[in-house]
């Protein structure tokens, strides 16, 4: 199940929030922004709900710290506030806060907002997967309705894609090689990649390889054995199997299909 971090100094409100989400989430609690940041780094939750006004570190400062850290920059944050003033709202929105909810709020509304945010995340994963290797350019009007990715997350994905490009023909590439190059911990890498693309690292590597293979087949410049080696899958039968799993047809059928489309 998904993990939620609640950051709230008021015991009653924290208890109320916990009661709303405990049936659907593994709920972790923190009493101020400093503890919230520590727990976010330790548990890397799927979503954070935080108050703004808190001792030691307020919600806005905590969000700034979360956004500045590669390990937590992808986590959606919902801020709760008693303040209706526009300044803190704008400040929150500039940080890429997913939502801003003014107290008092209804449990139903908060629940619906959280569901909506996590659904948007899944859309972002699907979009990102479709666009790995730039296979399907996104239409401009579609782009405007897409959820935004933070600059940290974009950098992470760009660097990862670049590493895959460089190592495409390296059949010995393993997940640890990517982790080392990206200079993050293994657990952060797994969680971040899964959050951003919906794929586990091994699936991601395979996805990149077969998508590149599809591009090479479409180019018509190479035979299947050459293509298999170029994408680092040195066993032609295994190559055919991976390809069929992804595209629902063998590489040869895909080639025929591509020819007919021209």
PLM regions and their residue ranges:
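Terminal helix-turn-helix DNA-binding modules in bacterial transcription factors
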Residues: 195-234, 257-262
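Acidic, metal-coordinating helix/loop segments flanking the phosphotransfer/catalytic sites
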Residues: 29-47
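Basic/polar phosphate-binding segments, predominantly the helix-turn-helix DNA-binding elements
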Residues: 175-204, 230-250
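C-terminal output helix
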Residues: 105-114, 118, 126
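Receiver (REC) domain active-site loop signature in two-component systems and cognate sites
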Residues: 54
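Charged docking surfaces used in two-component/phosphorelay signaling
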Residues: 15-19
């Amino acid at each position: 199940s998904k993990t939620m971090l609640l950051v709230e100094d008021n015991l009653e409100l924290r208890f109320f929030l916990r009661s709303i989400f405990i049936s659907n989430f593994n709920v972790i609690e923190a009493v101020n922004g400093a503890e919230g940041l520590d727990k976010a780094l330790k548990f890397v939750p799927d979503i954070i709900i935080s108050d703004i006004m808190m001792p030691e570190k307020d919600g806005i400062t905590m969000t700034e710290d979360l956004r500045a850290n590669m390990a937590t920059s992808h986590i959606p944050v919902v801020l709760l506030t008693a303040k209706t003033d526009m300044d803190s709202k704008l400040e929150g929105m500039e940080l890429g806060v997913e939502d801003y909810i003014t107290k008092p709020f209804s449990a139903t509304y908060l629940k619906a907002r959280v569901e909506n945010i996590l659904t948007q995340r899944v859309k972002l994963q699907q979009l990102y997967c479709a666009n790995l290797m730039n296979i399907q350019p996104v239409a401009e009007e579609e782009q405007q309705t897409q959820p935004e990715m933070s600059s940290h997350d974009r950098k992470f994905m760009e660097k990862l894609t670049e590493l895959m490009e460089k190592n495409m023909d390296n059949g010995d590439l393993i997940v640890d090689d990517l982790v080392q190059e990206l200079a993050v911990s293994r657990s952060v890498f797994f969680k971040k990649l899964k959050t951003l693309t919906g794929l586990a690292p091994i699936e991601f590597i395979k996805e990149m390889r077969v998508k590149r293979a599809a591009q090479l087949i479409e180019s018509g410049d190479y035979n299947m054995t050459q293509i298999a080696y170029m994408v680092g899958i040195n066993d032609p039968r295994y190559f055919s199997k991976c390809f069929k799993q992804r595209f629902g047809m063998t590489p040869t059928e895909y080639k025929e299909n591509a020819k007919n489309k021209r």
